[in-house]
Amino acid sequence: MTRKALMEKAKKEPKYSTRKVNRCKRCGRARGYMRKFDLCRICFRELAHKGEIPGVKKASW
């Protein structure tokens, strides 16, 4: 889990807009972030397998 200090720091508006860090809305992870869903890859995968993200299904070919 993400340290609380980093979560609070990410919520605060940065001095410059390029410093903004995208974080997962569910767990607060900064790496592997998917903008379209506001989730990290791990949370996205869990929710997709449960069928909780509309329009997303496992690829098969």
Swiss-Prot record:
Task: Please indicate if the UniProt record lists DNA-binding as a keyword.
Answer: no
Question: Tell me, what's a Pfam family for it?
Answer: Ribosomal_S14
Q: Which cofactor does it need?
A: Zn(2+)
Cofactor details (free text)? Binds 1 zinc ion per subunit.
Q: Please, which domain of life does this record's source organism belong to?
A: Bacteria
What are the protein's UniProt keywords? Metal-binding, Ribonucleoprotein, Ribosomal protein, RNA-binding, rRNA-binding, Zinc
Matches recorded under PROSITE patterns: RIBOSOMAL_S14
What GO biological process term is on the record, naming one? translation
- Cross-referenced InterPro entries: Ribosomal_uS14, Ribosomal_uS14_bact, Ribosomal_uS14_CS, Ribosomal_uS14_sf
Q: What does this protein do?
A: Binds 16S rRNA, required for the assembly of 30S particles and may also be responsible for determining the conformation of the 16S rRNA at the A site.
Indicate what this protein is called per its UniProt record: Small ribosomal subunit protein uS14
- Recite the lineage of the species: Bacteria, Bacillati, Bacillota, Clostridia, Halanaerobiales
